[in-house]
Amino acid sequence: MSFMKKSLLLVLFLGVVSLSNCEEEKGENENEDHEEHHEEKRLLGDLLGQTSKLVNDLTDTVGSIV
């Protein structure tokens, strides 16, 4: 009976440690995903800014030609 208790405690302990490691990795992955999403939004904002600048330059050029 003592052997079974020790085995059960060992299995439970290893399960808790494994679960803890999974939670840490999940948190790290969520942080990486959040950083990537933030970077994508920043790049999209830069792209939109450059596009609007290009459109303004083109309209100024076309306006000066006409």
Swiss-Prot record:
Keyword field contains Secreted: yes
Main location: secreted
Any GO molecular function: identical protein binding
UniProt signal peptide: 1-22
Keywords: Amphibian defense peptide, Antibiotic, Antimicrobial, Cleavage on pair of basic residues, Secreted, Signal
Annotated compartments: Secreted
Pfam families found in the cross-reference section: FSAP_sig_propep
Prodomain positions: 23-40
Name of this protein: Dermaseptin PD-3-7
